[in-house]
Swiss-Prot record:
Location (main, coarse): cytoplasm
Name of the molecule in the record: Probable threonine--tRNA ligase, cytoplasmic
Family listed: Belongs to the class-II aminoacyl-tRNA synthetase family.
Keywords noted in UniProt: Aminoacyl-tRNA synthetase, ATP-binding, Cytoplasm, Ligase, Nucleotide-binding, Protein biosynthesis
Highest taxon listed in the record's lineage: Eukaryota
Naturally occurring in which organism (per UniProt): Arabidopsis thaliana
Every TGS domain range: 41-104
Entry EC no(s): 6.1.1.3
Annotated transmembrane regions: none
GO BP of this protein: threonyl-tRNA aminoacylation
Gene Ontology cellular component list: cytoplasm
Amino acid sequence: MANNHHPKDEAYLSSVIPKRIRLFEEIQAEQLEQLQSRPHDPIKITLLPDGIEKEGRRWETSPMDIAVQISKGLAKSALVSSVNHVLWDMNRPLEGDCSLEIFGFDSDQGRNTFWHSSAHILGQALEQEYGCKLCIGPCEPRDEGFYYDSLYYGELGLNDNHFPNIEAKLPIRMAEFGVLHRNEDSGALGGMTRVRRFVQDDAHIFCRVDQVEEEVKGVLDFIDYVYRIFGFTYELTLSTRPKDHIGDLETWAKAENDLEKALDDFGKPWVIKEGDGAFYGPKIDITVSDARNRKFQCATIQLDFQLPACFKLKYLSEKNEMEAPVMIHSAVLGSIERMFAILLEHYKGIWPFWLSPRQAIVCSLSEDCSSYAKQVQKQINEVGYYVDIDESDRSLRKKVADARDAPYNYILVVGQKEVATGQVTVRLREDPEGRKDLPEMSIESLLDEFKFKTVNFL
């Protein structure tokens, strides 16, 4: 990505992108001219796998035209077709009598086409937004693709020269929002709180033995910071060595002792759950309660001396000896789906502004004000806030009532007076009687208030 060391090459982008567009338009115009000059005599189209026959015209009828004839649902879900067993764009005209099969995302052909096309779009977006350099690589949507020599990545490639420096850089912290699968019994599944496929804010810290206590305290502080923003109270549990553990007892004892020290220093009450740790190490679980007082384990910190040894991970210590690091598994939110379900009930649909999916709505008083209302919506949206618009001919009372029921945090009323002054009249979700409505505000002042609420998690 573009940064201070690798800035985006604006001159290159400004020259090559218009050239690409121009070339595309020239080829498109040439193809359209050729299509118009070719004969459009009737053809027979055999639909697979059913063998149903449809009529069409050469160089005119496309697979999408046939899909529309069959059903709107098929046309909407279609991604690619096969003409005489060769993949064919849905909008490309058919050239003669042929067999035709249409594929959606539920097929390998449809998925591979979607992933291939979306990868090109993603590449173009990354190039224009961050200045990434596009290169030719294998189209392997079902494979990992990590088959390049490390030298290909330049400074980013990991090689032997990096290993002596790793000790000096410990702890190394890595995090990702990863998709996980768990084979839950059907009877254990419940809404979004317990599912078989979920996203987790997975993080791993690699550190020296003497760094474990401070790193665990750092994760605990981070969890406390996030949960205080949400307004959660939580319980801390230390789970110790289970019967099916791996590793020696001395290592387990040290790991449990490190977590106990970190919890004591953290200063909040905690309890021990004997024998409930992971097979590879002890763990701290953080439990929160929803609006119905049901308890859910969300955040976790798991200490792992075993897996680094199993994978033979080593670093060169300051004693010039190869030693195994300690790995700390952690998650702050845990399952994103479960956390979202808890937040839904916790806030009862009345989201704070910084987290709200309906931060504001612009309500115009009349058709004459619609243009200014759209301008206000665009100005707020461009800064990054969620804002809708109500241009219907209903009464203002009805619009405001519906907006509060929705519920939008801010209701921005626009009439002739606001058009003339370049302002908006602000009504608040929390004040149905209108006693605490704000005075007219400029868009700049309103955005300042939005920013204040966002940065302060209000």
